Amino acid sequence: MAQEDVGHLSDAGLALGLSLGGGGGGTTDAAAAHRGGCRRPSPSSQCPPLEPSLTLSLPDDAAAGAAATATATASGGGGPAHSVSSLSVGAAAAAAVKRERAEEADGERVSSTAAGRDDDDDGSTRKKLRLTKEQSALLEDRFREHSTLNPKQKVALAKQLNLRPRQVEVWFQNRRARTKLKQTEVDCEFLKRCCETLTEENRRLQRELQELRALKFAPPPPSSAAHQPSPAPPAPFYMQLPAATLTICPSCERVGGPASAAKVVAADGTKAGPGRTTTHHFFNPFTHSAAC
């Protein structure tokens, strides 16, 4: 403990004073004797010999610690234990003063750093761009026409909107990103619906396949069905033709007349006489004559 206190005192700076006697005023008496000259004491005024004492204190920063040390030395008689206690008190005072100075220096350093950071933040903080309705409408129209701008278009649009070219460029970048994100969401929803439809169709096909397999591997019907009478064979198909009828041939009716009546054979197989005429010629529809 005494070594640590001495180390603190050596860091803070110490002053060593020499005095005679048990109190702190020995130094003053010695100085007065030095100014008055060296006088040999008379035998009648002999007093007990004075013991020299050392006082360790701070130079100017810890006057209170030095005063406390001097008071303790004057009252204690300057023994070894008392010297150790005096050093401890002085070391504590020096450590307190040093701690206070360090805290003040740290506080000033932190405050200056914070002030510099605030200044940097104020100078480099990006403020959000606030556009009017007219500016937003004009930017949207230009974006519908062209999603990207070349440097000349960018500068011209920035002058028209009273903005910086960098602000216009950033707005177009953000707008393209939002458009791409919306399109991605739409595509995702469409693909999700397609996936659900395909999944349902796959399930339906699986059910149909299972039903077909069940019908294919189904057991045969019971044997009692073999004794049942077999159904009658289907009746043969017959086509009924119409009956043969005699019809008048329009061609023969045109060519036939009184001049050729003698040559026409009657339907009953007899020839017609001179005074007998045949008015109509009947024929079978299934036999075609050359005249027809």
Curated annotation (Swiss-Prot):
PANTHER family linked: HOMEOBOX-LEUCINE ZIPPER PROTEIN HAT14 (PTHR45714), HOMEOBOX-LEUCINE ZIPPER PROTEIN HAT9 (PTHR45714:SF34)
Ranges of compositional bias, category Low complexity: 28-74
Gene Ontology molecular function terms on file: DNA-binding transcription factor activity, RNA polymerase II-specific; sequence-specific DNA binding
Basic and acidic residues bias (residue ranges): 99-109
Principal location listed in the UniProt entry: nucleus
Cellular component per GO, a single term: nucleus
Pfam families xref list: HALZ, Homeodomain
Protein name, UniProt field: Homeobox-leucine zipper protein HOX19
The UniProt record lists the keyword Transcription: yes
Location in the cell: Nucleus
Superkingdom of this protein's organism: Eukaryota
Gene source species: Oryza sativa subsp. indica (Rice)
Start-end of DNA-binding region: 124-183
Family the entry assigns: Belongs to the HD-ZIP homeobox family. Class II subfamily.
Entry-linked InterPro entries: HD, HD-ZIP_Homeobox_LZ_Class_II, Homeobox_CS, Homeodomain-like_sf, Leu_zip_homeo
Annotated region (Leucine-zipper), positions in chain: 182-226
